Amino acid sequence: MDTQPIVLVITDSVTLHAAIVSWGLQNFQVKAEDLHVITQADRLEGKLNLKSSSLDAVVSISALHTQQWLLELARVLRPGGIIVLQNPNSVNDDVKETLSALERILLLAGFVLSEGADGSIDGLGPLAVKGRKPAWDTGSSFKLKKKVAQKPANVVTFDIPAFKVQLGDDLDDLIDEDSLLTEEDLKKPDLPPVDDCEVGKAGRKACKNCTCGRVEMEEKQEKLGLPSDLLDNPQSSCGSCGLGDAFRCSTCPYKGLPPFKLGEKISLSQSFLTADI
């Protein structure tokens, strides 16, 4: 019956120092027939002729650990198996940098970092890093525990008193809105008369039954003796005609009119158009 190795020590070198083999036997507490050694691993092209999950531990001694190589080591390791990476070219000056690089590549390959390896190997210096393959494997499954539904605790309820509003009792207290209006409020406002006189060729002209006040305005214009163009576009040679009678001369054509702005139509108020008694 073909038995698979339990511990594997693999290196790129042609030979392996006997101290490394002794360290592996002592550290992993295995028999000599259970520890296998592979040299010149760089010729394997990243593939091991081993079954998946067949090793308990792997010690890899190489100056260059690639991501592909670590994934292959992870394949042959059992869940929970130990992996030790060693860079034989490391010196005391760059130990920290080497450790950091090896730890990083271990994590990227899916391993979990473990405590640092103790002791040293003759001729190679201290072991670099020690990791462990997670205790689960691809395709593994486990049952999820369902939470038992708990009975709801006793809920204390309170009866909220309800208040009913009797609308019929307050109807007598309502105030009539019309009673708040006075006689002055009820009177219709005096709206300004609408100019509805006929429009002829010379402009608007008071009709026979004029109610808008145009008759009175025309009578006032005739009384003042001013043509319509002077009322529509008042002008002044002295500049004081629009200021009022106090500033007008005795011959001013606008004498008797209220103050106005030059160039703007003179608007006569209703009180001004009322005929003098």
Curated annotation (Swiss-Prot):
User: What processes in GO biological process is this protein linked to?
Assistant: iron-sulfur cluster assembly
User: Region Fe-S binding site B: what ranges?
Assistant: 238-252
Q: Where is this region: Fe-S binding site A?
A: 197-212
So where does [4Fe-4S] cluster get bound? 238, 241, 249, 252
Q: Where in the cell is it found?
A: Cytoplasm; Mitochondrion intermembrane space
One GO CC annotation, please?
mitochondrial intermembrane space
Provide the GO MF annotations for this entry: 2 iron, 2 sulfur cluster binding; 4 iron, 4 sulfur cluster binding; electron transfer activity; metal ion binding
Q: Where is this region: N-terminal SAM-like domain?
A: 1-141
| Family matches, as InterPro entries | Anamorsin (IPR007785), Anamorsin_N_metazoan (IPR049011), CIAPIN1 (IPR046408), SAM-dependent_MTases_sf (IPR029063)
Question: Its quaternary structure?
Answer: Monomer.
The UniProt function text for this chain reads: Component of the cytosolic iron-sulfur (Fe-S) protein assembly (CIA) machinery. Required for the maturation of extramitochondrial Fe-S proteins. Part of an electron transfer chain functioning in an early step of cytosolic Fe-S biogenesis, facilitating the de novo assembly of a [4Fe-4S] cluster on the cytosolic Fe-S scaffold complex. Electrons are transferred from NADPH via a FAD- and FMN-containing diflavin oxidoreductase.
**The protein's name:** Anamorsin homolog 2
- This protein's species is Picea sitchensis
Write the lineage as a comma-separated list: Eukaryota, Viridiplantae, Streptophyta, Embryophyta, Tracheophyta
